[in-house]
Amino acid sequence: TTIKLNDKMIFSYPKICYIPSERNFVAGVPNFSKYNEGNNVLLYFAYDWSEAKEDIKKLDISNLLSREVSYENINDKDYIFDNGSKLLLTNASSGVQSVLPLYQTIIYMLSNLYKKQRALSPSKEMARKDFANEMIMVANRIADGENISNFKKHSNILISMFKMLESYDVKAINKFSDLPPKELSHNIYEAVHVLDRLFNYHFTQLFIEEPEQNLFPDTQQEFVYWLLEIMQNDKKHAAIITTHSPYILFALNNCMMGGLVRDNIPEEEVSDFASHSAWINPKLVSVFELDNGTLRCVQDEDGIIEDNYLNTAYKKNSEEYLELLNYYEDEE
């Protein structure tokens, strides 16, 4: 495998997480992650969520559901505390079974995952350590004055590394003698350090399917606001969301409009808007609809969402209701 670095930027390795619409099925089946038959995204999500639950034993989800609801893992069993009532997750409402794995997995993948060292398989970890130790040994011996001709078997590997990892701290050379010994030694150290970063995740790429499933419109809106807020950090996380809900798009539009007019709003009025912590530059967002197998962008020149299939269907229903309302006679 060849890794090419563009614009002198170090390669960033993503953690990819797919959250399927069937997540409430995973939540409704005890110990689902222990099943290993087949090779599908539902199982991969079960493994990701299981990893999240290992790390997050307690979680308050009240802010999304607008009522007192929390999760706790007790003796390896998942419990929900709903307005004081304790019940197994498998017996909870479909809304809770849908939002908990969504919420818990996202928190872990965007935040908690990066608070610990990534665990590699034993074979990969051994290979990483052996390679790093050998290259550092070469760097130390060169720094101590040993003749570079003694490292012919390492030169091709290291020169290829230098070219692959060329950045501000790693210099690309054609042969060892292109650099003084001390500088060559330093170059090896830097290359090993940069290469070591390739084993760690640098950002998360989320694929979220139907976040609106089993959720009230208010909860859908709160989810969008929360997601955009938690994604705003130095990791440069990304998300691809598929939806059939106009409420998801309405909430996203609020966030983009807020990002567009932020500088025009008096500071003391910013917090009056529910979406203020999730405002985002519309240029960072792309919105498409699928029409007869063709993708069509539904944003205007400012990036704001224009009329689309979901919005049109919503308006059509509203218009019919208003027409019928003309024939309604209030007996009072």
Regions found by a protein language model. Give the residues of each.
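Phosphate-coordinating catalytic segments in nucleotide- and nucleic-acid-processing enzymes
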Residues: 1-203, 278, 286, 293-297, ...
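Walker B catalytic acidic pair
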Residues: 209-211
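C-terminal lobe/lid and adjacent interdomain/linker elements of RecA-like ASCE P-loop ATPase modules
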Residues: 194, 218-332
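Walker B motif beta-strand of ABC-family P-loop ATPases
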Residues: 205-207
